């Protein structure tokens, strides 16, 4: 049967980053791991899927192997297709170029990098937790408690995975090595043991409570300290609080991804803040001092006379102190001149008189309006 494309196996594109490839592998490896799937037909399918995913990741996670695969496809990494790399390079050159792609395929000719002699340990998968906080909490820092998954040793089998009264035995197929050697022509390949799936151990009678995993899933509370100035989408890593490792491997990490709620007054742009502030017609025309809220209290700034709608004022240092830079950003106040509404007849008459007096002065009082009228006349003339 023809092998599937490695990128297709992991469900990523050919331009996927190393991090994306790693995340895809961890997700699929945990899904299809034999310890998580029952025996029988479904378990056999999961086992084949696990092997396929593992092989794809081994190729795409190594820069040299990935480059060979991208250029030549399976022929660049499959020993059964090695004839395509003959000629002046020969087998020695192929081994030198592709090093330890297959562990012990080329023995000492592959730079002396031989496969490991024991069960292969796998690092646990990382976990992600999404947290939503207010803009004020992001600006000043925050401490929160979160509930996350946790794995404890099974209290029925005390963590060894075997039903009480039975024992964990050394795998009779690989004799505890976790890997077996398979000869194909003049190649000797080292593969994961099909019986113990790389653990080196065999449990004839798995624990009825944890189903041979040795651990039970629970919940625990973690204290999370959010630094002042954290921005949207930033992540906080909690080392060792991810899923447990396999075959004695280290646990993964927990990543707390921070999201900031929309604020009724401020919009954030990096370390700067923006706000829209309505001002009266009289204040815009005559000027005055305006009071504006900030995340650290109130601030006052002068508005000059003849201020137009859309004018922006910058208040230095009234933004958010950057989590990386350590310096505060600025607050930008965008003023909008508000048109009076629901006027009385007396007020309307006063405005009409005011408007007539303004226009009697020509362009001196309304330069933009006069400029617009001149353009209109020119357009229709």
Swiss-Prot record:
Signal peptide: none annotated. Homodimer. Zn(2+) 1 binds at residues 154, 157, 207, 210. A zinc finger (CR-type) spans 141-219. Its cofactor is Zn(2+). Residues 357-381 are annotated as: Disordered. It is found in: Cytoplasm. This is Chaperone protein DnaJ. One of its GO terms (biological process) is chaperone cofactor-dependent protein refolding. CXXCXGXG motif repeats lie at residues 154-161, 171-178, 193-200, 207-214. The J domain is necessary and sufficient to stimulate DnaK ATPase activity. Zinc center 1 plays an important role in the autonomous, DnaK-independent chaperone activity of DnaJ. Zinc center 2 is essential for interaction with DnaK and for DnaJ activity. The keyword Metal-binding applies. Pfam families: DnaJ (PF00226), DnaJ_C (PF01556), DnaJ_CXXCXGXG (PF00684). Its main location: cytoplasm. GO terms for cellular component: cytoplasm. Participates actively in the response to hyperosmotic and heat shock by preventing the aggregation of stress-denatured proteins and by disaggregating proteins, also in an autonomous, DnaK-independent fashion. Unfolded proteins bind initially to DnaJ; upon interaction with the DnaJ-bound protein, DnaK hydrolyzes its bound ATP, resulting in the formation of a stable complex. GrpE releases ADP from DnaK; ATP binding to DnaK triggers the release of the substrate protein, thus completing the reaction cycle. The gene is dnaJ.
């Amino acid at each position: 049967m023809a092998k599937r494309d490695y990128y297709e196996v992991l469900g990523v594109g050919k331009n996927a980053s190393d991090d994306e490839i790693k995340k895809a592998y961890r997700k699929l490896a945990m899904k299809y791991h034999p310890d998580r799937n029952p025996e029988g037909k479904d378990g056999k399918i999961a086992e084949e899927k696990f092997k396929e995913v593992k092989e794809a990741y081994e190729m795409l996670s190594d820069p040299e192997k990935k480059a060979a695969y991208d250029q030549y496809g399976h022929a660049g990494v499959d020993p059964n297709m090695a004839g395509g790399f003959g000629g002046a390079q020969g087998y020695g050159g192929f081994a030198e170029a592709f090093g330890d792609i297959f562990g012990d395929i080329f023995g000492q000719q592959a730079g002396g990098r031989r496969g490991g002699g024991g069960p292969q340990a796998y690092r646990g998968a990382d976990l992600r937790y999404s947290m939503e906080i207010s803009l004020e909490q992001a600006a000043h820092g925050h401490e929160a408690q979160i509930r996350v998954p946790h794995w404890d040793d099974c209290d029925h089998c005390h963590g060894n995975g075997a039903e009480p009264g039975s024992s964990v035995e050394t795998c009779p197929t690989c004799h505890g090595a976790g890997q077996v050697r398979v000869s194909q022509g003049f190649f000797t390949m080292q593969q994961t043991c099909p019986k113990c799936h790389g653990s080196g151990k065999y449990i004839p009678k798995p624990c009825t409570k944890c189903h041979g995993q040795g651990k039970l899933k629970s919940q625990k509370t973690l204290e999370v300290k959010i630094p002042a100035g954290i921005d949207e989408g930033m992540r906080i890593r909690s080392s060792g609080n991810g899923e447990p490792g396999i075959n004695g491997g280290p646990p993964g990490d927990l990543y707390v991804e921070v999201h900031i709620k929309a604020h009724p007054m401020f919009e954030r742009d990096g370390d700067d803040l923006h706000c829209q502030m309505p001002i009266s017609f009289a204040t815009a025309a005559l000027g005055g001092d305006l009071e504006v809220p900030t995340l650290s209290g109130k601030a006052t700034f002068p508005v000059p006379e003849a201020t137009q709608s859309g004018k922006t004022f910058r208040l230095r240092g009234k933004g958010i102190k950057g989590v990386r830079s350590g310096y505060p950003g600025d607050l930008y106040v965008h003023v909008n001149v508000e048109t009076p509404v629901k006027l009385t007849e007396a007020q309307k008459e006063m405005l009409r008189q005011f408007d007539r007096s303004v226009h009697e002065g020509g362009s001196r009082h309304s330069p933009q309006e006069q400029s617009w009228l001149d353009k209109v006349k020119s357009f229709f003339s």
